[in-house]
Structure formats: C-alpha cells, structure tokens
Amino acid sequence: MRKKVTLITGVSGEVGLALVKNLADLGYANLLTLDIRPLPPEYTKYSNHIQGDILDKSLLNRLVSEYDIDAIFHMAALLSTRAEFTPVAAHQVNVEGTMGLLQLAAEQSEWRGEPVMFIFPSSIAAYGMPDLESKSKF
C-alpha cells in the first residue's frame, strides 16, 4: 500500500522551509520533501526528505509508485540572476521540471480517482521585464 503524503519540491529555500514548518504546525504529519540540497537538520523532524532532482524521471516514477500524493507544493525553480546566466538550465528546471511534476500529478490523480492539488506559487518576476529598456532601469 502506498503511503499518503503531501509533496513539497524546492524545500531548502527560505519559503520552502517556512512552508514545511507551517504545514507541520497545522498538523500535516505526512510531508515528503524533495530538493537537490539536503534538508537542514533542524527541519528533518517535519518531513521525510529525498535529496534529488525534479528533472530525474526515474525518481518521479519511483515517487508515483511508492506514494499516494494528494497535494504538491512546487517551489523548485532557478530564479532571476542565476536563470539569466544559465537560460538552458533555467528552462529545464522551470519549464520541463514543472511539466514533469504536472504529469506526476495527473498520474496520481488517475490512480486515486480524484484530483491532486497542485500549488505553484510565484511572483511577478516570473513574467520578467517587458523589454531591455525597462530592465536597464532596475
């Protein structure tokens, strides 16, 4: 039997860590976290952590087979400056990684017979500046 969990990707960032603690404080007992970085030791009590990459299709397949994922909080991303300097990597993580997680959610939904909640927080920065002139002002 697969274990029912809430999945949080990109958990090692500031927002991800706050989310894990808040969800745990609200009584979410079955948190599964995923990040390319290890979880800080003081947060390991809140979740079962997997150190891995959202681009790793075999890892995502393993998650589908081992866990009954009822919700996904997708926080993993390459942001701003790093994304500008590594646009191919940014596209892979931000677009292809997100698509992989959406496919995972669809598979889980099919197995469960009910929707998987997919939360994808972002900011206005996701849209970028409309043109180079606007960007140069900042």
Q: Where in this protein do the model-derived segments appear?
A:
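Conserved catalytic-core motifs of eukaryotic protein kinase domains, centered on the activation segment
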Residues: 44, 82-89, 129-134
